[in-house]
């Protein structure tokens, strides 16, 4: 497949909502910056669940966030299509700030910022989460993220991939 250059596609949805599956299914793995993978490199695989309960280390999260933005910035220097695989289930003010950082990077590197929303219901996400690993968010954490996700709106400067009518983002390469 051939992808439009100078495009950043942000995936947005609950854990286990299908974001990483979408990346794999559409052959986007090599074009993806995955927050989870970067966090696992820094903190170790499943670092937050080492003691049988969810314990988030703010230093690991901060470093993973900074490294994700740095990786995106470095990839933008090549002009390549980029997918950012991150839940982005955040309170509205934090989501706005996160998208503003990405928008600023896009402006610097002449990129267009898109998002794809994954509206998978929380019960399905909880079921998938339990099936794939014991190291997944608890129901309480997932429901908190759902509340943020359902009540948040992407800032207007981020284009909606699903409702844009723009089907040229992912183009089949002509032989």
Annotate each predicted stretch with a short phrase:
Residues 2-12, 17-20, 29-31, 108-109, ...:
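Conserved GTP-binding G-domain of TRAFAC-class P-loop NTPases and closely related GTPase folds
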Residues 12-14, 35, 84-87:
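Short His-Asn-centered micro-motif
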Residues 44, 93-95, 127:
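Short glycine-/acidic-enriched loop or helix-start segments at secondary-structure transitions
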Residues 25-27, 47-48, 97-104, 129-132:
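Short, glycine/charged-enriched secondary-structure capping and boundary segments
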Residues 58-114:
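Glycine-rich phosphate-binding loop used to anchor ATP phosphates in small-molecule kinases
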Residues 20-80:
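Conserved substrate/cofactor phosphate-moiety recognition/catalytic segment
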Residues 37-39, 89, 119-124:
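Conserved nucleotide-binding/hydrolysis micro-motifs of P-loop NTPases
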């Amino acid at each position: 497949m051939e992808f439009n250059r100078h495009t950043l596609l942000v995936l947005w949805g609950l854990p286990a909502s299908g974001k990483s599956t979408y990346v794999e299914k559409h052959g986007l793995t090599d074009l993806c910056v995955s927050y989870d993978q970067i966090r696992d490199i820094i903190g170790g695989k499943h670092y937050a669940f080492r003691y049988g309960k969810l314990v988030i280390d703010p230093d690991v999260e901060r470093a993973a966030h900074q490294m994700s933005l740095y990786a995106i910035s470095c990839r933008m220097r090549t002009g390549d299509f980029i997918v950012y695989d991150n839940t982005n289930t955040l309170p509205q003010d934090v989501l706005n700030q996160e998208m503003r950082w990405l928008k600023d990077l896009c402006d610097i590197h002449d990129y267009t910022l898109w998002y794809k929303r994954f509206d998978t219901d929380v019960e399905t996400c909880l079921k998938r989460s339990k099936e794939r690993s014991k190291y997944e968010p608890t129901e309480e954490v997932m429901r908190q993220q759902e509340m943020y996700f359902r009540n948040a709106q992407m800032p207007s400067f981020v284009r909606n991939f699903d409702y844009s009518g723009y089907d040229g983002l992912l183009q089949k390469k002509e032989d």
